[in-house]
């Protein structure tokens, strides 16, 4: 969504959208800190989702959706990462990408594979919007291109 000044302004998130954003943040946290899924999930449920943190209000999120994403990504990461690496150039492997970008791509790909009930356009739009919230460069375009390519391959196989 673009505001009157031509700048990106994120849409108000629904509970699933808020869960996706929180899941990306949790995956990033687990990647950086090395915390486990259940520890991170408990922290988000108790102290983050729908809570006020240092004057910022976390959006209320669908906790079950959040939990499904983070547990699914961690469980399936050995399958997701090679699929994502195939979409990247030889010079830019998944390990070279920013941690938050890796989290966005992993969560988006996991949802494309495992949540066939969610339209492709919704998954792509949500994760591109998350990328726009974190990046001002070409990263959202990269997320769009990779998820679009993967969606075509995945949905053809199913």
Curated annotation (Swiss-Prot):
Example GO BP: transcription antitermination
Primary role: Involved in transcription antitermination. Required for transcription of ribosomal RNA (rRNA) genes. Binds specifically to the boxA antiterminator sequence of the ribosomal RNA (rrn) operons.
Gene3D superfamilies for this protein: NusB-like (1.10.940.10)
Similarity-based family: Belongs to the NusB family.
SUPFAM superfamilies assigned: NusB-like
HAMAP family in the cross-refs: NusB
Highest taxon listed in the record's lineage: Bacteria
Matching Pfam families: NusB
Any GO MF annotation of the entry: RNA binding
Protein name per UniProt: Transcription antitermination protein NusB
Annotated signal peptide: none
InterPro entries recorded: NusB-like_sf, NusB_fam, NusB_RsmB_TIM44
Any Gene Ontology CC annotation: cytosol
Species name: Bartonella henselae (strain ATCC 49882 / DSM 28221 / CCUG 30454 / Houston 1)
Keywords attached to this entry: RNA-binding, Transcription, Transcription antitermination, Transcription regulation
Gene for this chain: nusB
